[in-house]
A protein has these predicted regions:
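An N-terminal assembly and electron-transfer interface module characteristic of large anaerobic redox
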Residues: 1-392
Length: 392
């Protein structure tokens, strides 16, 4: 019963992360399911769906298809849906294909031999979370489309892990890009908002990767090994956070050294605190970035990150927490004492009522948690937009 939810909705699953990453790239994406999984993504996990065009389809999997394994019918459906403008095709799994052992990569290989465009098969299953789907999609895009090169773009940067699931559909993505341009950096490729496949093909020309969500970490590590491109994992929150962030990017370009904001520069490494005890419950790199910026202003306060989408130990400090199920969050908030909690508004109901008067709760909506209930209330968190939260 570990994953039973009594108060929180299910978090955005892996196939939603894949679809969100591929949304703007003019491919055709097919979720192999009976309809519910596709509707879950288009209805609840994708703020761009209404008012945009993207070829994301359901395979209309039926009982006899599952029993007999009629993969040829699926291949024919995808072939018929492709147009001359289709750049690639992606086939994604869901719970039923996982249970019957469907081979998504095999289906994609057979499909590619018949339509002569790149095809991607990903074994998503609906049980893993969206950040794993982002990782899977970015790795697949890089493997297929990124070209080896020794040429580097002057002050060239890639942005990894950027989707509306983490950034919302307000100005956060544009604000980050404009800040980077203002600092003199040239954006080579952004995975995957405001991007084309031609940009992704040139990604190896960058001098540093900027990782803005946990979903981008897998590709960052691959590109660090394969192309010797260092990464900076973090978001420039607040004026002080932007200052540290820029220095980290400059250092990565000059000295080929990776940096994790809110970990490598964090001063307090123990739970013995002098000031306030604070927890950021949400996406790990957002939490790290909050901590990194907040600690520069309030050096005696302790900021802990509660990772509700899984904890990546390579970007965490010792007492960060993996609280990826509801019961863990409830136990934490019942047993620990916090002065400030930063989290999605739906998390507030898990705080014991007798503690609410003594806690400052800062609302920080996340699409993967509260979906369309609060996605219009996602704060602007790039640069000085965050000063009002960090300076208080």
């Amino acid at each position: 019963m570990k994953y039973l939810r009594m108060y929180l909705p299910p978090f955005a699953p892996d196939y939603s992360g894949v679809c969100s990453t591929l949304f703007e790239l003019r491919g055709i994406v097919v979720i192999h399911d009976a309809g519910g999984c596709t509707g879950n993504y288009t209805g609840y996990d994708e703020p761009r769906w209404y008012g945009s065009k993207s070829a994301i389809f359901c395979s209309k999997l039926r009982e006899m298809d599952a029993v007999l394994g009629l993969d040829n019918d699926l291949i024919e459906k995808i072939k018929n849906a492709c147009t001359p403008e289709t750049k690639f095709a992606a086939v994604l799994g869901s719970p039923v294909p996982m249970l019957i052992g469907s081979d998504m990569n095999g289906i994609a290989t057979e499909l590619e031999s018949q339509i002569n465009i790149p095809c991607i098969g990903l074994d998503t299953n609906g049980f893993n979370l969206y950040n794993k789907g982002i990782s899977m999609a970015e790795k697949a895009l890089a493997e297929i489309f990124v070209k080896d090169t020794n040429i580097k773009v002057q002050n060239g940067v890639n942005i990894l892990g950027m989707t509306p699931i983490d950034f919302g559909l307000n100005e956060n993505a544009n604000d980050l890009k404009e800040m980077l341009k203002h600092w003199g950096y040239n954006i080579v490729a952004c995975f995957s908002m405001g991007v084309k496949l031609d940009d992704i093909a040139n990604a190896a020309k960058a001098k540093v990767n900027i990782v803005v969500s946990q979903g981008g970490m897998a590709l960052a590590k691959i590109m660090e090994t394969k192309y010797k491109i260092p990464y900076v994992a973090g978001i420039p929150m607040g004026d002080v956070g932007a200052e540290v962030f820029k220095k980290a990017v400059d250092n990565a370009i000059e000295n080929n050294k990776s940096f994790v904001f809110g970990k490598d520069d964090y001063k307090i490494q123990t739970k013995d605190v002098v000031g306030k005890n604070i927890i950021f419950i949400g996406e790990q790199i957002q939490g790290n970035s909050w901590r990194g910026a907040y600690n520069k202003i309030h050096p005696h306060d302790n900021v802990q990150v509660g990772c509700i989408f899984g904890k990546d130990t390579s970007i965490s400090i010792d007492y960060d927490l993996d609280i990826s199920n509801e019961n863990d969050i409830i136990n934490l908030l019942s047993n620990e004492e916090y002065d400030i909690i930063i989290a999605d508004p739906l998390i507030k109901q898990l705080i014991p009522k007798e503690k609410l008067n003594n806690i400052k709760f800062i609302s920080f909506p996340h699409v993967a948690v509260s979906s369309k209930i609060y996605w219009d209330n996602i704060p602007l968190f790039i640069g000085d937009n965050m000063n009002k939260y960090l300076l208080d």
